[in-house]
């Protein structure tokens, strides 16, 4: 059990028998009336996002989630195989569980897998990943008044928009949450 004062991003709540992760929250103390907490919750299994408001100080059920360091090994048909870094046990996870994070998964990458009662829930990538550009068109400078972007294909097959000066073979830092370009990696 936890109270609204314990809310933080990533906390997993049990609501109506389902697991929900807090992805955003705001404590509100209006001039008139009691304080409350607005939360944005994401269903762990379905990915559905809902807004829910709690009165301040309310107790809520929390789930114990074990986040384990793993290494992504390979893809086997519809499954992604991860190896636990402590006991070297391999966990094949279905594509539905890996979700959108699959577009930035590279063999040998260290990621975290969240477990609840021994059942894998979801995969967490590092916030920034370093990937190489495998294909992009040459950028033409000077034909626009502001900085432009162009599409680029990364070594995982994901496509992102990058500045015009990026070339094939460059290694980039990419935000794994939204796929945005963060910068070049100095080699």
Curated annotation (Swiss-Prot):
Signal peptide: none annotated. GO terms for molecular function: translation elongation factor activity. The keyword Zinc-finger does not apply. Keywords: Cytoplasm, Elongation factor, Protein biosynthesis. PROSITE patterns: EFP. Gene3D superfamilies: 2.30.30.30, Nucleic acid-binding proteins (2.40.50.140). GO terms for biological process: peptide biosynthetic process. Pathway: Protein biosynthesis; polypeptide chain elongation. Its main location: cytoplasm. It comes from the Bacteria. InterPro entries: Elong-fact-P_C (IPR015365), NA-bd_OB-fold (IPR012340), Rib_uL2_dom2 (IPR014722), Transl_elong_fac_P/YeiP (IPR020599), Transl_elong_KOW-like (IPR013185), Transl_elong_P/YeiP_cen (IPR001059), Transl_elong_P/YeiP_CS (IPR013852), Transl_elongation_fac_P (IPR011768). Coiled coil: none annotated. It is found in: Cytoplasm. One of its GO terms (cellular component) is cytoplasm. Involved in peptide bond synthesis. Stimulates efficient translation and peptide-bond synthesis on native or reconstituted 70S ribosomes in vitro. Probably functions indirectly by altering the affinity of the ribosome for aminoacyl-tRNA, thus increasing their reactivity as acceptors for peptidyl transferase. Belongs to the elongation factor P family. HAMAP family: EF_P. This is Elongation factor P. The lineage of its organism: Bacteria, Bacillati, Actinomycetota, Actinomycetes, Mycobacteriales.
């Amino acid at each position: 059990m936890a109270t609204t004062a314990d809310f933080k991003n990533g906390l997993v709540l049990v609501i109506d028998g389902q697991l929900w992760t807090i992805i955003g929250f705001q404590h509100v103390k209006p001039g008139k009336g009691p304080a409350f907490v607005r939360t944005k919750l994401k269903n762990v299994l379905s990915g559905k996002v809902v807004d829910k408001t709690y009165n301040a100080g309310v107790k809520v059920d929390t789930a114990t989630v074990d986040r384990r360091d793993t290494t992504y090994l390979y893809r086997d048909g519809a499954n992604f195989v991860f190896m636990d870094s402590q006991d070297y046990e391999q966990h094949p996870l279905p594509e539905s569980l890996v979700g959108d994070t699959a577009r930035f998964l590279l063999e040998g990458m260290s990621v975290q897998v969240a477990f609840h009662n021994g059942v894998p829930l979801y995969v967490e990538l590092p916030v920034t990943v370093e990937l190489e550009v495998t294909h992009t068109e040459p950028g033409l400078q000077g034909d626009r008044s502001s900085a432009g972007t162009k599409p680029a294909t990364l070594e995982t097959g994901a496509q992102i928009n990058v500045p015009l000066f990026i070339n094939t073979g460059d290694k980039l830092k990419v935000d794994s949450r939204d796929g945005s370009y963060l910068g070049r990696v100095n080699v």
